Amino acid sequence: MKVTQHIENAKGETLFSFEIIPPQKGKSIQELYDNIDPLMEFKPPFIDVTTSREEFIYVNKGNGLLEKKLTRMRPGTLGICASIKHKYNVDTVPHVLCGGFTKEETEYLLVDCHYLDIDNVMALRGDAMKDEQSFVPTKGGNKYASDLVSQIYQLNQDRKSTRLNS
């Protein structure tokens, strides 16, 4: 169900939802469930799941040299969304970023949302990378959240409930 439908169906009643951050690589999803379980008593109609921008890390190559490598420290947004939707029977809202994604990668993510029956996304420009003074869009990606919303709309013909935040 779309977030807008949840709000309409509430008929003025207060709704509680929350936003979660995917665990770091190597952590168990069970830790995430352990944090979500006590919050389910509030009956959230939907749960937002953030997407972390990629970042540079330095990896020791073993010969005293460091290699600069681009990585995501908290991957798995869509997998977590699908898992929460299945385990708790609650709608999920993955964050979709301009930063770190080409338009083609965004399209693939939206196709995955469709296959997973995820009807909502939150479109965000995203933050600048840690070593950038200001936001620099990914080559071949969207510069503004409004551009991202336009892409989502065009690809899905308004199938998704898109919340805009820049």
Predicted regions and their residues:
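N-terminal amphipathic alpha-helix/helix-capping segment at the start of soluble metabolic enzymes
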Residues: 1-18
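Acidic (Asp/Glu)-rich catalytic clusters
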Residues: 8-11, 36-43, 79-89, 110-118
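Conserved, mostly hydrophobic/aromatic
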Residues: 19, 47, 113
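Glycine-rich, proline-tolerant flexible connector loops at the mouths of alpha/beta enzymes
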Residues: 23, 42-77, 129-140
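Glycine-rich anion/phosphate-binding loops
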Residues: 27-33, 98-115
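Phosphate/pyrophosphate-binding betaalpha-module
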Residues: 132, 136-160
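Conserved small/polar residues in nucleotide/adenosyl-binding loops
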Residues: 160-166
